[in-house]
Swiss-Prot record:
Phylogenetic lineage: Bacteria, Bacillati, Chloroflexota, Dehalococcoidia, Dehalococcoidales
Recorded GO MF terms: 3-phosphoshikimate 1-carboxyvinyltransferase activity
Residues involved in 3-phosphoshikimate binding: K20, S21, R25, S161, S162, Q163, S189, D303, Q326, K330
Species for this entry: Dehalococcoides mccartyi (strain ATCC BAA-2100 / JCM 16839 / KCTC 5957 / BAV1)
HAMAP family named among the record's database cross-references: EPSP_synth
Record's protein name: 3-phosphoshikimate 1-carboxyvinyltransferase
Amino acid sequence: MKIHLDKSLPGGNIAVPSSKSYTIRGLIAAAQANGQSHIISPLIADDTLATRQVLSGLGININTDTGSESWEITGNTFKAPSGNLFCRESAATLRFMSAVCARLPFECHLLAGHSLMRRPMLPLIQALHQLGIEIETRGNTTVINGQVITRSKVSLPGNISSQYVSALMLMAPACTHGLEIHLATPPASLPYLKMTKQTLGSFGIKVHSSIDWQEISIPPQPYLPARYRVEGDWSSASSFLALGAIAAPVFISNLDTDSFQADRIMIKFLAEMGAEIESGQNWVKVNPKPLSGINADLTHSIDLLPALAVAAACAKGQSILSGVRQARIKESNRIRAVSQGLSAMGINIIEEDDRLIIEGGQPKGAEIDSFGDHRIAMAFGILGSVVGETHISDAECVTKTYPDFWKNLESLGGKVTQDV
């Protein structure tokens, strides 16, 4: 699907969807608890439905009759799957469930979607090998021969993806002797490890971590059933936060300003650029002001790259977005996708190994390739609605995390039409 955006000045009120990261973590924790848990206000999108589908294929009963407000999970009813378990394009589902399947006493085949096949799994596979697990990748399939895990020490790099570490944390309580996880390098995206620890705590799991988070210890212990409420998603909010900074005031509800989510830092970056930020209990308002360039380190908030780059393109002066190397191994090579998109819109941009240098200017409409990446589509959807005459390919990719994105943009006054 291709979207056409005419020039407009979108602004107004919007409620962002629930957090993908917290929904997936909550589902997997609830699946391992004895008894019934409730996930309140889950995100319903491709990635979370992938996790739900995989868990259902493993025998976990997830009752969704209550609709979108609550899912009821009866945990610890795992059984050998009757077929392949499809993870769609969800890296979190593939990585987290690879670890969970490793501690189940049967063979599992996890299938990856097309773009997910390109994303690295080796550090997690090597970590599971250290624990005695037989796991290998065959084309788009990860084959796991699970077993009772009696080894308790594992080491892996922390600087490639926090998801490998979170995967081990989610499986650790069910290991015979728990797990002691050593990170050979400082962790990237540290807030995501804190989110995993927070979720585990909600289900009764005690986690011990060193100050630098390079040593994590989780004793063997049972998951306890819980009522687990999912907060709003700061990553999904980031494009609309950028919109408020470059177009018209935007009021966003369902955002916890005390959240552990890494991408909460977006409002700090926008404030440093000159935007006016107001906030209260569960809401943020961004008012546009003349923006200046920024030096921003995105090491722990890599998903902000597209949205912050769009704001930088509209700012006066140069912006340097550093710590972005790992953006190359997301749903697309986001460094290349952002660079190509902004260049097509007339913005001077220099692409380096670990940073982007953006000279702010006056973007113009262009043909934008989203590369099937939801965050690229959303960020350029915002910019395209402000400058007009913009076409975005594969625009349906937003269903990965934000199915109502285009509808919400229209509700704010964006002129969005689907090309036929």
